[in-house]
């Protein structure tokens, strides 16, 4: 059982991510020429969605963090900001390995961007470098007493093999 302050922080992180996602929804809607009222309604629908409430505040799931990171990845990919896409996606994969299941969509977006603009490979390469730096910064503190990088590969293999489906909460046949 977590002490009260630890439990509050544990619940606060997913709830804060939900609020940031709601604000991002508003900003994207405004950018796509929605009126302030329309964008506000979308933001409120996102912020007060009962499923989101239950997932983050009720069950204290970290899925809201992953959702926000993937939402940012999609947003920056659409904007063509590959130097932001790559490190944020790496962070999403490090938060929850299930983010790897969307990697093929990212690859398709990269291929399409390269077809449209052959000069975007430079920001993409910089983004890959930033993703590697992100991985090193996040993983290094946990690797001190693990004896190499194999612990992380084993952890990901174990985690991904424990999920035969993309989700365990729906009607998988």
Question: Which stretches of residues belong to each language-model region?
Answer:
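Primarily membrane-embedded glycan-assembly and transfer machineries that use lipid-linked glycans
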Residues: 1-74, 110-173
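Membrane-interface alpha helices of multi-pass inner-membrane proteins
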Residues: 54, 70-76, 83-106, 137
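Short, solvent-exposed helix-helix connector turns and helix-capping sites enriched
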Residues: 35, 81-82
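Short A/G/S/P-biased low-complexity tracts
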Residues: 40, 80-81
